[in-house]
Amino acid sequence: MVLTAGDKANVKTVWSKVGSHLEDYGSETLERLFVVYPSTKTYFPHFDLHHDSPQVRAHGKKVLSALGEAVNHIDDIPGALSKLSDLHAQNLRVDPVNFKLLNLCFVVVVGRHHPTILTPEVHVSLDKFLSAVAQNLTSKYR
């Protein structure tokens, strides 16, 4: 999926709001994921999955930091996510559908905290970007 110049600008606008809240928004995204899609909990058997768990907060920050890397390298998402793609495909073996579910939860979190910036056009751009991220994270699956 090709991101237009407008899409890239929209994603960067969203990230200008999100980037200073990585731990909070990341943890909220994961908590929402675990509640709405309980099967995703199976990848975290060693985590305390309760609200505001330090493990969920730390992992949420890590997830959104990786998204931030993709935003910062929006013209080379495959290069920015290559090592993470290897990790998920070869070691963690996360079912690819879970990236799409995470993306849905992240968009809800963005909309909840920044409803005025999540216009239909921005929503489409963010969805295209997140789809590109998910596609790249699963590109090394066999």
UniProtKB/Swiss-Prot annotation:
Tissue-level expression: Red blood cells.
Occurrences of domain Globin (ranges): 2-142
Record has Heme as a keyword: yes
A Pfam family it matches: Globin
GO biological process: hydrogen peroxide catabolic process
Gene3D superfamilies from the UniProt entry: Globins
One annotated GO molecular function: peroxidase activity
Origin: domain of life: Eukaryota
Sequence positions that bind O2: 59
Residues where heme b binds: 88
InterPro entries: Globin, Globin-like_sf, Globin/Proto, Hemoglobin_a-typ, Hemoglobin_oxygen_transport, Hemoglobin_pi
Keywords, ordered alphabetically: Heme, Iron, Metal-binding, Oxygen transport, Transport
Any one GO cellular component localisation term in the record: haptoglobin-hemoglobin complex
Family to which this protein belongs: Belongs to the globin family.
Record's function text: Involved in oxygen transport from the lung to the various peripheral tissues.
Record's miscellaneous remark: Hemoglobin A is the major, and hemoglobin D the minor hemoglobin of this species.
Subunit structure: Tetramer of alpha-1, alpha-2 and two identical beta chains.
PANTHER family: HEMOGLOBIN FAMILY MEMBER, HEMOGLOBIN SUBUNIT ALPHA
Protein name: Hemoglobin A subunit alpha-2
Annotated source species: Aldabrachelys gigantea (Aldabra giant tortoise)
Organism taxonomic ancestry: Eukaryota, Metazoa, Chordata, Craniata, Vertebrata
